[in-house]
């Protein structure tokens, strides 16, 4: 009985810590940049045609393709879909399409921290 109670306590503690980790993964501040010039019409890692000036998309090194993100910067927000891998410059977490970056004003600074929330 005592060992059963200990197992329940350990399992409960694990479940609580896992839930906290998942919540942290849903909203985060990440270093973002943008990309697009010279890449229009190329295939993304997911197989989609890259349309940087008309579509709100993003590249992430680890989020699954099809993940929708709410990206906020300077009081402006945009919803993007992860369709590509990258960025490939050290320290950056997210690459936004030119259209998405322009929507929130990131094209002026080029690289900056943004708030990111996973929507699905």
Model-flagged regions — what are they?
Residues 2-8, 14, 18-120:
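Secreted/periplasmic proteins
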């Amino acid at each position: 009985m005592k060992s059963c109670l200990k197992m329940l306590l350990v399992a409960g503690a694990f479940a609580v810590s896992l839930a906290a980790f998942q919540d942290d993964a849903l909203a985060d501040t990440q270093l973002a940049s943008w990309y697009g010039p010279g890449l229009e019409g190329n295939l993304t890692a997911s197989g989609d045609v890259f349309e940087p000036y008309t579509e709100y998309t993003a590249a992430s090194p680890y989020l699954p393709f099809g993940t929708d993100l709410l990206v906020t910067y300077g009081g402006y927000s945009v919803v993007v879909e992860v369709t590509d891998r990258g960025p490939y410059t050290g320290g950056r977490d997210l690459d936004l399409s030119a259209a998405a970056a322009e929507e929130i004003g990131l094209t002026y600074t080029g690289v900056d921290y943004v708030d990111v929330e996973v929507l699905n």
